[in-house]
Design a protein with these regions (language model features):
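Mature-chain termini and adjacent capping regions
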Residues: 1-276
Length: 276
């Protein structure tokens, strides 16, 4: 028979428990489940509640809030009070995992704050998307309210199509399905390289849009422009506005260029009413 406890706005259960009144410690043992509002915590192992500190420590725990899930080898949670079982802050050590909207994020440790709805991930941060790309960074911040993953420092994206993208920072918007790369953006596909200060990946269109001084480097030639689009499935980039192609010291200018990543060559194309 399970042990069941009810707080003012919370609930817990476990297979059995022990209680040390002098130390103010309750140990819930096996198949632990706690609930407060839309937040649930589960662990198949034991969980230790330090009543005097409003603290809860558990191994192999899973915290679920709405559609978001946080897992950790060891989770230390602090309650607002022991009557509500409402989590105020939580820390995860060891293998840490977040699941939300088809995304999986991993790290070696994490921090959660209920007030801001932010989960901060540290050390070996990795995001795996169901569409086939993987993003890594030094630091990751997930906002449960905005539904965004912010990646900081040494951002790197690898896709099953074969390209690699790097930047200093990145923001993945789960609602709009966009991934914005900022500062020193570089995309490599074979011998082709695209650089720009800013790029946005549109997941539904499967394309990157580049802004502010785009540069494509290929075998023996470079092409620059104010903006551009890389069509991943077609494996070509289209550059527009103040296009300049340089090859073997020769320079040509125009309004639009196509950089073919299959042949590693760029060419100017005429727009209606445009110029070459």
């Amino acid at each position: 028979e399970k042990v069941i406890g009810n707080g003012e706005k919370g609930y817990f259960e476990a297979d059995k428990f022990t209680f040390s009144k002098p130390k103010g410690i309750i140990t819930l043992i096996n198949n632990v489940y706690m609930k407060s509002g839309d937040t649930e915590l589960r662990t198949p192992d034991k969980a230790v509640m330090f009543m005097n500190e409003n603290k809860f420590v558990s191994a192999n725990a899973t915290v679920k809030k709405g559609n978001d899930t946080l897992k950790g080898d060891t989770i230390t949670a602090f309650f607002k009070d022991t009557k509500r079982f409402e989590i105020d802050r939580a820390f995860s050590n060891g293998h840490t995992e977040i699941r939300s909207e088809g995304k999986k994020a991993f790290a070696d440790r994490g921090e959660y704050e209920a007030k801001t709805g932010l989960v901060k991930l540290f050390d070996n941060v990795k995001i795996i998307d169901a569409s086939g790309y993987t993003a890594t960074a030094d630091i990751g911040i997930y906002s449960s309210t905005k539904k965004t993953f912010t990646l900081q420092n040494n951002v790197k994206v690898k896709d099953k199509s074969g390209y690699t993208a790097v930047a200093k920072n990145g923001i993945y918007d789960l609602n709009n399905k966009t991934f914005t790369l900022l500062n020193n953006v570089r995309i490599d596909k074979g011998s082709n390289v695209i650089t720009a200060p800013k790029a946005i990946y549109f997941q539904q269109k499967d394309e990157f849009r580049f802004y502010d001084d785009v540069k494509v480097t290929q075998d023996g030639n470079t092409a620059t422009a104010l903006s551009g689009v890389y069509f991943i499935k077609k494996n070509i980039a289209e550059l527009e506005h103040n296009v300049v192609i340089t090859k073997d010291g020769n320079v040509v200018r125009g309004d639009k260029a196509i950089s073919d990543f299959n042949t590693s060559k760029s060419r100017l194309v005429a727009k209606k009413g445009g110029r070459i």
